[in-house]
Amino acid sequence: AQNLKLQSSLLIPRFDVVRQVFQKAGGSGADYRYKYFLSSATFDFDGESYALYDRYQGQDSLYQQMIPMLRTSEMYMIATEVTEDLEEATDYLNTLRVNRGLREISSTQVEQSLEAEWLRELYGEGQLFFYYKRKMKTEIQSAYDPYGTKTINLLRYVLPIPDGETKYN
């Protein structure tokens, strides 16, 4: 049964990386995304500890493949990004954080906390690419080193045009 679960998981990240990503929130144990989707099942392989990502485990394979198009949490983060009123931005982000089991932050912490919330909220979905592209990030959290970063060339954000799009145009 354990082997079957490993094969059906969408992501099996290193546990030390997961712990670091979620501890940035001020205590990983409180964040329900960590508590319910990542901390419950771990295993060791070749001297490393890994977490099983169980966010979309459900009754059938279709449920496991579902990724929401847009969710309320994204709306709060987008509102935080675009509002010019710092107090309003803080309120939006704090609404999200409180609903994730985290403590509120001050207005001086909004910018750094927002990126961390995008990372935690979209963890394992492949959607973080679009945040990084929009912000033109050249350094992102490493997937292999809990305290490291990975340098990204901005050209990596430019996707090739499919042949089918240019053949008849």
Q: For the regions a protein language model found, what residue spans apply to each?
A:
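A surface-exposed, glycine/aromatic-enriched loop/edge motif typical of exported proteins
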Residues: 18-19
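Acidic/polar-rich alpha-helix caps and helix-coil junctions
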Residues: 1-13, 23-169
